[in-house]
Amino acid sequence: MDSGILLQEYIEESNGEDLRIFVVGHKVVASMKRMSTLEDFRSNVHRGGQTEKVKLSKKEESMAIDAAKHLGLGVAGIDLLRSKRGPLLLEVNASPGLRGIEAVTGINVAKEIILYVEKNFRNNKWR
């Protein structure tokens, strides 16, 4: 087999939970906790994971914003785990799905993205 392997540390204290944080224009616009089902340790909503609104710590919020900035992303879905060592960066999504986050938070994330795109296009930041 000629392919790469990615190994990832298992964070037991996360208990199959993670945080999805939507960053738009260097600010957090919405966040939710995703929880896995008994059948699957992954918390993805499209795999049946449950969601609830969550209050982020200042460290979680700044970590999400910094991750998006570091990768040059104006829109990003940042996934964090809560651990005994503090928040851990799990994944950065450059094209995050909206499934679940608007319903659980009551925030129109799509509108926030559109406003961000309009503002940056108007200011010629993409030309």
Segments the model singles out, each with a brief description of its role:
Residues M1-L71:
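Phosphate-binding site of ATP-dependent enzymes
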